[in-house]
Amino acid sequence: IVSWCILRGKCRSCGAKISARYTIVETLNALLYLWVFYHFNGIFNPLRAALVCLLFSALIVVFFMDWDTQLINTYVVIFIGLLGVAEYIFCKDQTGLTLKSHLIGFFIVSVPLLIICLITHEKAMGMGDVYLMAAAGLFLGMQGALVALLIGLITGSIGGLIQKHRSGDSVFAFGPYLSIGIAVAALYSEQIGSWYMDFTGLNEMMNEAMLIIR
């Protein structure tokens, strides 16, 4: 980052221009790492913070690759899934997520997206989005996967409207917006989930249902 600024975005040997994206990505990655360690108090929870940092790095790759090519690398998705397995094995006491929650998270969003994908013949979204949410759901658990989808749909709708207004093109990559949702859910799924339940009145409805069942 420093060398790019000193050299004014040019190669030292040949003088060719170096894209600002490299610096933007590196800066974004560093800032996200700092925020994750601050959020999880990384000095006392280094493994949990490290896993989320790796997740964020993978999401940055997904974001820019899908934005440019409308393709999501399968190996990156597998890596995210492996992070989910590692989180359950090593951090389940910190996350409070059970194996059941991780497994439900794997299916609860990916299966509906798969159905939509098959019905629309991948016109609404691609299989990469399905695989991404399956892997992310394994990491986030049930509530986190739902929050990630909610944020992805909101940001995707806004981004899609802006793109259609600017270029008239209604086709856009959904992966970047899902990546934003996954990143937000990795840090704030409990807070957003609780707020949404209160806002929609679902908390009260569930409490009343439990009273009836009892």
Language-model regions: role of each:
Residues 1-21, 203-213:
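Membrane-proximal soluble regions of multi-pass membrane proteins
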Residues 12-31, 75, 123:
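Alpha-helical transmembrane segments and their cytosolic membrane-interface
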Residues 54-57, 61-157, 194-214:
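Functional transmembrane core segments of multi-pass inner-membrane proteins
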Residues 34, 38, 89, 114, ...:
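Membrane-embedded alpha-helical segments of multi-pass transporters/permeases
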